[in-house]
A protein has these predicted regions:
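N-terminal ligand-binding/catalytic initiation module
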Residues: 1-79, 85-87, 91-94
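Glycine-rich phosphate/ribose-binding loops and adjacent secondary-structure elements
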Residues: 75-117
Length: 117
């Protein structure tokens, strides 16, 4: 399914339906979904709204990526990339400090059995 091909109404129904099906696995102390490819603040708003309806009270901490107007965090839209940059910078500093060469192969996944995003 390509969310870019859905109408706004269909996208909202899909988002709310996803929460309804996974409700019992989500929550502030369990799993807090975050935006990913092809999601945005509107989608996350629908999701937190649906979760809150099911929970019977407002639960802004159950989803990240919400707009600031409903409890989102300033800078969230770039936080993942910024965190990745910090990790890369720390890694490069450690390599330079050890005076090691960085080996890059044409296929860095060759021979690997698992990939973690």
């Amino acid at each position: 399914m390509n969310p870019k091909e859905l109408s706004e109404r269909e996208l909202e129904q899909l988002s709310r339906g996803w929460v309804q099906k996974l409700y019992k696995y989500l929550g502030q102390l369990d799993d807090v979904p975050a935006p990913d490819v092809n999601t945005n603040g509107q989608i996350m708003s629908w999701m937190v709204d649906e979760y809150s309806k099911l929970a019977g009270h407002w639960t802004p901490g159950t989803f990240t990526g919400k707009p600031l107007s409903i409890g989102g965090s300033l800078g969230r839209d770039t936080a993942t990339a910024q965190g990745g940059l910090y990790v890369l910078e720390a890694y490069l500093r450690s390599v330079i400090a050890k005076n090691e060469a960085i080996q890059v192969s044409e296929n860095p996944l060759q021979g690997k059995k698992i990939v973690i995003q």
